Amino acid sequence: MKRILIAPVRFYQRFISPVFPPSCRFDLTCSNYMIQAIEKHGFKGVLMGLARILRCHPWSKTGKDPVPDHFSLKRNQEGE
């Protein structure tokens, strides 16, 4: 199941992301964050990854935002 959820992210990383300049504001890129979140939390990791993508904009804080050990849609406090 996790491999099926990760496959579209890998496709994005391999074929779509290289076409655009790097724009992620976080140390762990949003696509890598989603992969780690899916590996840790299964389908809930997809929701965490989508929430992370919504946090990644020019007015957000930058820096580290690691995947938390527990399910949360908020930024990891360790990252602030």
Curated annotation (Swiss-Prot):
It is a peripheral membrane protein. Residues 62-80 have a biased composition (Basic and acidic residues). The keyword Cytoplasm does not apply. Residues 61-80 are annotated as: Disordered. InterPro entries: Membr_insert_effic_factor_YidD. It is found in: Cell membrane. Its main location: membrane. It comes from the Bacteria. One of its GO terms (cellular component) is plasma membrane. Keywords: Cell membrane, Membrane. Could be involved in insertion of integral membrane proteins into the membrane. Belongs to the UPF0161 family. PANTHER family: MEMBRANE PROTEIN INSERTION EFFICIENCY FACTOR-RELATED. This is Putative membrane protein insertion efficiency factor. The lineage of its organism: Bacteria, Bacillati, Bacillota, Bacilli, Lactobacillales.
